[in-house]
């Protein structure tokens, strides 16, 4: 029961530094089952007694709740010059699980509703731990730890969350916090060991800062000073009081005992130190901006996407997927890329068209690399051929599902009241107003009460059906001349790209894509600044003519060229093979006879007699 092994998980930074390793405790199966049974029994009571200041370790709550409210506050303050400046105080506890005092944590759990002998059992399970570290050379010697909260154990996160929640309750009752739209108090938002204090700039910010310092000291916790920041939110920062906030700092020194060989770790109080001021800060994976600029987070997503795309293609190329290549590529796109760049996308406020396009271009860049096509390929065709819906519709879906989540919260919950205030006192670009526009655009004629009443699965079904119809129409409306010959009834991957019985290589699939979308390197497909181009036979050249031209291939072809635009893979392959042979003969002929375009492009200039073309097509030179 009291045996545990530590497995290290690398964090950001050098792998050579011990401080960049996080230790996760792995406990015995018997202990895990017992603690899980206790947790399942006591969680409802604990959750009921926790405040909305803490979203960590709670069911149906998470990062997006806090990000949504913080972005809402920033958006509201930036909506008018008349709004009072707000100061965000961002705090992070250093190695909180190592610092938690077990007896204090259990006292807070008792206040949260656990008052029977379960408390004694939790205490005995954590009073003394015999731990060892998993290393490349095996387990280390076991050492005894006393009165610890195990990170990775069933009760670890909830014990930490309840401790921070107790600080949040003190802050709420102090009255130092901010009131959203001058009505709803929002003083502190936490997610396990990450906190954001929210006050008006000035003396209230100093009062809140002092209170958090005192309550943190009472819990024997320590701040990670480098991660603590303050952010002033206002239209005009001139003449706004913004003195430095301070937190307690502790310094750690290691002393080696030469006689015993032991290393002693000593912590020394270093006093109050200033925390840095910033205009943008990463909080729970989302880049906050003091001006409410969505591009700060979008640019971070664009940078992040570079290595994700490289990682995806590295996997695709190493797995030798053959006919499963494109299908797996789209799966990786959804699972690895989209899930990363659209993280917390439902919490954006006033997202502009240009900002949406910046997010969509990330995926479009991936699709261009997947098909190995140039920037001239129509964007709509990338989506339609791959069976992929643009990111804007995924954002709408996430936003409306989050709307459903908020509406299903208890009426007294903070996030529910937060949203209701947006409906009652709307400002331009409010999240609530955006949701109503989404419902109208997707032609979902439901009131908020009806959305609240319907089941989640039914609402998802309505959303998916509506998005599929609207996304298809949106992409069709964006089409130009290229790809217009292809008929799409729904958004799904084209038949020639999915596994089939035809012997098609990956390059062959890409070539069919370029044929269907007129991206083959033929002058008529790129007509800008070019005069009309004729084939060597004197007829106006286009892709269909190259396919049928007898001067390139004397064999009579019965398969219509237009079958390349159909869903019949067998006919598509027949057209592709004939066209590929003809285009290669044509290119070789042009190269050997040094044909030049009249406009210095790749158009065919009529210089040699037609007889030479006839002879060339029959193998005579």
Give the ranges of each region predicted by the language model.
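Conserved, non-catalytic sequence blocks in retroelement Pol enzymes and Pol-derived host proteins
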Residues: 26-31, 55-64, 79-80, 94-98, ...
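Helix/loop segments that flank and initiate small ligand/metal-binding modules
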Residues: 444-540
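Short Cys/His-based metal-binding microdomains
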Residues: 526-575
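Short, conserved micro-motifs composed of acidic
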Residues: 137, 224-279
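Conserved pre-catalytic core of RNA-dependent polymerases
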Residues: 1-166
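Catalytic palm active-site di-aspartate
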Residues: 3-6, 22, 70, 86-96, ...
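Non-catalytic, peripheral interaction segments enriched in hydrophobic/basic residues
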Residues: 191-193, 224-229, 233-235, 240, ...
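Long, charge-rich boundary regions
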Residues: 564-619
């Amino acid at each position: 029961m009291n045996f545990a092994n530590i497995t290290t998980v690398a964090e950001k930074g050098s792998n050579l530094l011990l401080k960049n390793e996080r230790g996760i405790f792995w406990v015995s199966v018997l202990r895990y089952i017992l603690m899980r049974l206790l947790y399942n029994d006591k969680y409802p009571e604990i959750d009921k007694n926790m405040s909305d200041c803490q979203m960590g370790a709670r069911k149906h709550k998470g990062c997006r709740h806090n990000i949504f409210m913080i972005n809402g506050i920033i958006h509201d303050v930036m909506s008018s010059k008349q709004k009072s400046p707000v100061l965000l105080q961002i705090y992070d506890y250093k190695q909180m699980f190592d610092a938690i005092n077990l007896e204090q944590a259990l006292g807070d759990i008792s206040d949260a509703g656990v008052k029977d002998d379960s408390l004694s059992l939790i205490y005995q399970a954590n009073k003394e731990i015999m731990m060892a570290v998993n290393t490349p050379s095996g387990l280390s010697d076991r050492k005894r730890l006393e009165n610890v909260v195990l990170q990775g154990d069933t009760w670890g996160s909830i014990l930490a969350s309840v401790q921070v929640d107790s600080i949040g309750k003190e802050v709420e009752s102090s009255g130092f916090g901010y009131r959203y739209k001058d009505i709803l108090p929002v003083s502190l938002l936490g997610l396990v060991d990450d906190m954001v204090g929210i006050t008006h700039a000035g003396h209230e910010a100093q009062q809140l800062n002092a209170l958090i310092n005192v309550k943190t000291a009472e819990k024997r916790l320590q701040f990670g000073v480098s991660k603590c920041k303050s952010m002033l939110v206002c239209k005009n920062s001139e003449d706004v009081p913004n003195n430095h906030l301070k937190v307690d700092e502790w310094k750690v020194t290691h002393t080696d005992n030469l006689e015993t060989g032991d290393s002693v770790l000593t912590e020394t109080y270093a006093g109050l130190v200033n925390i840095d001021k910033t205009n943008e800060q990463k909080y729970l994976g989302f880049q906050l901006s003091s001006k409410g600029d969505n591009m700060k987070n979008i640019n971070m997503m664009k940078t992040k996407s570079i290595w994700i795309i490289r990682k995806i293609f590295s996997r695709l190329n190493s797995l030798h997927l053959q006919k499963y290549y494109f299908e797996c590529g789209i799966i990786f796109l959804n699972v690895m890329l989209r899930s990363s760049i659209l993280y917390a996308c439902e919490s954006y406020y006033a997202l502009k068209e240009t900002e949406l396009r910046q997010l969509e271009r990330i995926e479009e860049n991936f699709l261009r690399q997947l098909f190995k096509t140039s920037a001239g390929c129509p964007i709509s065709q990338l989506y339609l051929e791959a069976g992929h819906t643009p990111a804007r519709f995924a954002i709408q879906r996430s936003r409306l599902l989050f709307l459903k989540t908020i509406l299903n919260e208890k009426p007294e919950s903070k996030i529910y009241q937060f949203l209701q205030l947006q409906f009652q006192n709307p400002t331009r670009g409010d999240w609530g107003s955006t949701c109503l526009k989404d419902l109208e655009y997707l032609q979902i004629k439901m009131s908020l009460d009806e959305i609240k009443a319907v089941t989640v699965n039914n609402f998802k079904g309505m959303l998916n059906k509506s998005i599929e119809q609207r996304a298809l129409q949106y992409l069709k409306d964006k089409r130009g001349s290229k790809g217009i010959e292809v008929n799409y009834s729904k958004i799904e991957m084209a038949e020639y790209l999915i596994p089939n019985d035809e012997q098609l290589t990956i390059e062959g699939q890409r070539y069919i894509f370029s044929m269907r979308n007129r991206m083959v390197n033929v002058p008529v497909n790129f007509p800008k600044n070019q005069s009309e181009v004729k084939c060597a036979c004197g007829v106006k050249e286009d892709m269909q003519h190259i396919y049928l031209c007898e001067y390139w291939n004397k064999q009579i072809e019965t398969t219509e060229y237009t079958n390349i635009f159909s869903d019949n893979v067998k006919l598509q392959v027949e057209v592709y093979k004939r066209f590929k042979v003809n285009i290669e003969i044509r290119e070789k002929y042009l190269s050997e006879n040094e044909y030049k375009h009249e406009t210095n492009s790749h158009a065919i200039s009529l210089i040699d007699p037609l007889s030479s073309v006839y002879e060339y097509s029959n193998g005579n030179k």
